[in-house]
């Protein structure tokens, strides 16, 4: 750090802004990772058709204005003490814009799967670049969505100077510069540093090379300086112009950094409405159904593997709304965390849920089957089962899904040695214990729950010269607060039920596909 003496607490401060699915969160941190202030602002989603999901980009900027100003006020922070800013965002949320950033259409959210047919055409090419996407292009990603815009909204496509992601757009709003995060490009745009960079051969096969002229071609890795905060942006946010703006990336990958998962054999378990699994490897691991391997997507010289479950916390929310609304209402009235109330219900039932099995494919399966037509299932019901059994089985089914991903990685040569957990789902101590018991691996917790915001602030601190590397920054700014150890006797019980969980998909797959196809299953998210 060039002889810089780190204060115990206080400035310099670093502002992390994260555009999420349900809202935007801003946070201010010091060099030791202490939270100075945190603020959240929600915004709506629009669902004009089944399987479609859109947002108004102007809502993101309004949310940024509100949360940054609130952080400055509530944290009693002087704007001149903000040393650097970075922004991360959900991915892949795509929008067509003119060169001034004016949207030509609502943003097509990451969960939107209208580009299913375009993704299938991409997969049919069997282009070698797909090897770095788990062998299968997702309709969530940039190329399928951009191709959908061209084919279904030709005037919008023709009039758009750029087709960008939410993260590009937010950085432009801060700096008036169009750049692309290398993190996003590698993970969602089929950019491959070890295979020549931009996916020209794939685009040529699709006769879609023109999209290259609509992408910001300057690539910056996370932690690299983009520019300075403009006068206009500073006015909107209640800051001062000239603050360095540092490149961020995908929110889940920022969360990985905020968990200190920047070393080989570690895995970040980010549990929200869905669950993301990011693992760090010294070597490329090609695993069917696992996205990647992504070279230098975050950490120089290292590869990242990404697994995912499309619906985990969202299933628990579904259960709470439909079967435990009274308990949830009572918890809200007394200011109790909903997971505390739900844990009390699920804890009434022993491991294995008395033979009840939940298949967590309510929104399809992302890893390892990459099957958008898969459906959720609850089987093994008897008249002795209660709603507590169903909730316990949901907890276990989601944890079985994570274990399935870990087992898939292990089969292909990658052994996870340490798991670090965050996200709203990490507030459930019972659920984390079930994850640890099923996987038979310790789970580490950190002091800051909002790890994507912390990780984004770490990008800012590193990129503005206060640390020599991202790993050096995480060493100082991320603190382990606890560890959950597996219960070996519970693990032995779960081994029996995990086998039934895995076999259930193959027993039900044809039925799932028949029903999904009849009911418009292509709306289901990957």
Predicted regions, residues:
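Conserved phosphate-binding catalytic cores of ATP/NTP-utilizing and phosphoryl-transfer enzymes
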Residues: 4-10, 151, 230-239, 249-266
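Short glycine-aspartate micro-motif
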Residues: 12-18, 26, 81-87, 163, ...
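Gly/Ser/Thr-rich active-site cleft segment
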Residues: 19-21, 32, 129-250, 316, ...
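N-terminal phosphate-binding loop and adjacent alpha-helix
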Residues: 39-78
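Short, hydrophobic/amphipathic alpha-helical packing segments
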Residues: 61-69, 143-146, 250-254, 312, ...
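Stable alpha-helical structural segments in soluble proteins, enriched in small hydrophobic residues
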Residues: 63, 67-75, 170, 259, ...
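Phosphate/pyrophosphate-binding loops at sites that engage ATP/ADP/AMP, CoA/4′-phosphopantetheine
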Residues: 64-83, 153-157, 202-212, 235-237, ...
